[in-house]
Amino acid sequence: MTPEQLPIEHYEDQLAEKVTRLTTMMSAFNAPEVEVFRSAVSHYRMRAEFRIWHEGDDLYHIIFDQQTRERIRVDSFPAASELINRLMPRLIEKIRDQRLLRFKLFQVDYLSTVSGQIVVSMLYHRKLDEEWQQAAAALRDSLRAEGFDLHLIGRATKTKICLDQDYVDERLTVDGREMVYRQVENSFTQPNAAVNVKMLEWALDSTRHSAGDLLELYCGNGNFSLALARNFNRVLATEIAKPSVASAQYNIAVNQIDNVQIIRMAAEEFTQAMNGERSFRRLEGIDLTRYQCETIFVDPPRSGLDDETVKMVQAYPRILYISCNPQTLCENLTALSTTHDVTRLALFDQFPYTHHMECGVLLTRRH
């Protein structure tokens, strides 16, 4: 596979290999048959990051080969959205002869949406001044004149200049309902929008007719919490990153959802609060005992759940676990399967043509 050519003819083979691998990994837990959710074969990534290589008067996007660290020129990137692919050559064309914009530019990050918005972050090894800002504003305006719904950001050491805003608003139709999700550059968002919708709809289907409330750890910008809110009386969600919490609060308001409460704290801290080991000022005014959480939702980082959180999670009748690393999922399941059964298993092909697998399990406590 090269950055400019995807092995589309091998998509089915690579997906089948993942299904086999996940089935084998999960066999120890008596898991049901894998529900498989495919990706589009191209233009599936909504974000992309490139280094910028300067060669005389020319400059262009590059990536590095993960094995050899060889530099690879990238003029088109079919894994990324069509919007990113349209913008890449136009951006390079416009900054090639603009010394203020190209001088010590070393990276460009793109974050696009299905709704047609895009934010571009330009990273520099130099101080950004008023002159840069004026040149960047002219660049933004000329790209907007070409029809791009675009926002530009300049970054340098300890500097971030937003010409307008540092976010885009994504619009996704989830099980017949349009959801708006504010996504801030440089914070976590699901990269494959179409597969993200499939994940949300699977989570909705897995929690239909739920009793009580939902607790979610690692909620990010509210991606899952807001979609799942319709299945529960109330949702209590935790997140540690400030920009994600701010986005989640905005998303609650813009989607007119009134039964979701976001708390800014780490999952480990929340475990301590739930166990009565520590009190936190951030929890003032929130009576945790009022929540009747029958279901807990976790979408942890690649490292999985720590031992204390695993113990806390085990107290809930139903556990919905989304994992970006089946290896640590299986490590967690070694403990969780002593009290719970795996009743659903899903593979979401977020990252086609790579070894990465995103999967989901629903665990139900044994009686």
Curated annotation (Swiss-Prot):
GO terms under cellular component: cytosol
The protein's name: tRNA/tmRNA (uracil-C(5))-methyltransferase
Principal EC category: transferase
InterPro entries: MeTrfase_TrmA_AS, MeTrfase_TrmA_CS, SAM-dependent_MTases_sf, TrmA_MeTrfase, U5_MeTrfase_fam
GO biological process: tRNA methylation
Pfam families the UniProt entry points to: tRNA_U5-meth_tr
Active-site residues, record numbering mapped to chain: C324, E358
Gene3D superfamilies with a match to the protein in the record: 2.40.50.1070, Vaccinia Virus protein VP39 (3.40.50.150)
Function: Dual-specificity methyltransferase that catalyzes the formation of 5-methyluridine at position 54 (m5U54) in all tRNAs, and that of position 341 (m5U341) in tmRNA (transfer-mRNA).
Regions annotated as coiled coil: none
Methyltransferase keyword on record: yes
EC number: 2.1.1.-, 2.1.1.35
MF term (GO), any: tRNA binding
Phylogenetic classification of the source organism: Bacteria, Pseudomonadati, Pseudomonadota, Gammaproteobacteria, Enterobacterales
UniProt key word Iron-sulfur: no
Keywords of the record: Methyltransferase, S-adenosyl-L-methionine, Transferase, tRNA processing
List of residues binding S-adenosyl-L-methionine: Q190, Y218, N223, E239, D299
Protein source organism: Erwinia tasmaniensis (strain DSM 17950 / CFBP 7177 / CIP 109463 / NCPPB 4357 / Et1/99)
UniProt similarity note: Belongs to the class I-like SAM-binding methyltransferase superfamily. RNA M5U methyltransferase family. TrmA subfamily.
Domain of life: Bacteria
Catalytically driven reaction(s): uridine(54) in tRNA + S-adenosyl-L-methionine = 5-methyluridine(54) in tRNA + S-adenosyl-L-homocysteine + H(+); uridine(341) in tmRNA + S-adenosyl-L-methionine = 5-methyluridine(341) in tmRNA + S-adenosyl-L-homocysteine + H(+)
HAMAP family named among the record's database cross-references: RNA_methyltr_TrmA
